[in-house]
Amino acid sequence: MLTTAINGGIVVDVIRGTRHRRNLGIENGRIVEISETPLEAQEVIWADGLTVAPGFIDVHGHVDGNDYAGILSAYQGITTTVGGNCGCSPSSIGDFFRNQESLGFPVNQAMLIGHETALREEAGALDRYKPATEEQIQTMTQLARKALQEGACGISFGLDYVPGSSLDEVIALAQVCKEYDKICPVHTRLLTDKDMYSLYELFQVARKTGVHILISHFVYQYCNGLVEEGLRMVEKAMKENLDIQLDSGMYTNWTTYFNTATFDLQNIQNSHWRWDQMIVATGEHTGSVMTEELYYHMKEKHPCEAIICFERKEQEVYDCLVKPYVMPSTDIGAYAEGEGHPQIAGTYPRYFRKMVREKKLLTLEEAVYKATLLPARVFGFDQKGSIEKGKDADLTIFDPATIRDRSDYPHRGKPDAKPDGIPYVLVNGCLTVCNGEYTGRRCGRIIRK
């Protein structure tokens, strides 16, 4: 008898762009049967009236082994998360993988090796305002090769956070990534709030190396009136056969840590941000609006907290995510309960609510494809992203009519409020979310590339 059956649901075929009532049989963590008649199994999930989709793949997160972030990911239908983004990762990918395999995890994890916290720091290039030396670059390339051989799915960059990093060191590492046929996700370098050189820099890297580049959280980088121009530049580069794709969050208001170069006073002034555009997202001042006095207090006493910056150009989110080469992503971080940005619990429910149900910018099939098979193909996750016999049984079962985000900003509500409309999530065939509640099962696997 089958281990698990999902009967009566409307199954999304992301390969053909269709959906049909089908019944799924699962055994040993994989889909083994797709039937037009209901199936018997040890565990039967009745999904009448619900959509059965491949599990969502979050290409830009910072879960990195944090349990609560993993649980929040599962609540919003994510079954695979890519960590180590923005140049920030564990220094040893091999050690991280072994540790996570011994502990288990709520969702699957793939990891990037980070330019700043792993490669630069291990090579001794500790000053983020200075370029690495030739010797340090050579050390970084050796460390990168080791990480890629251990299964990292690429090299991530957070050029905003390391303003001193040279084009030479980025190109050297991108060449290593290309050697292994892996991807470079890049949080672009913004010198001002109107900086488009950041994109030209990436195009230059792509031309010189041929590496596959993923521009991280595109709207968060350019949502101050530059998205239209930025997309035009990207599409022109794609016509030159540069291998470029984008991911984007569902919010106009982004967050990062206070101790990064982003919140240097000079950068705040260059970006023309007002104090009242910044909200403290973590720690004892959670929900407080930034003031000059609070800024200096936190610089001295609380430099490691997260800050949300409000920019408010919502239409640019939709203009970006409607593009066929853009994937949704969360930028989820590892926060304590009740803290953080609403993206940690609301990104994918908000994506389906806004893009499909309310604004009708995407069909349901298109939206599911962009959250599943497209990222699986971009990262080469061959066993993920579609509902086919033999594929891993990563499945998200939701109601398109009721799916919605309930999370809010910390000065208004709960950033980690669970969404509505996602009753079941299976990770490698294990029922990880049942009736909207986490079951405690830790069936996520490490994805080595």
Annotate the PLM regions.
Residues 125-126, 130, 134, 140-157, ...:
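Active-site neighborhoods of metal-dependent hydrolases
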Residues 9, 24, 29, 49, ...:
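Divalent metal-coordination and catalytic microenvironments
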Residues 52, 69-156, 242:
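Divalent-metal coordination cores built from histidine and acidic residues
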Residues 1-40, 367, 403-407:
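N-terminal metal-binding scaffold of metallo-dependent hydrolase/deaminase domains
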Residues 55-65, 159, 184-190:
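Histidine-centered catalytic micro-motifs
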Residues 29, 376, 382-407:
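Structural signature of the urease/amidohydrolase superfamily beta/alpha-barrel
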Residues 318-325, 330-331, 396-445:
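C-terminal cap of metal-dependent C-N hydrolases
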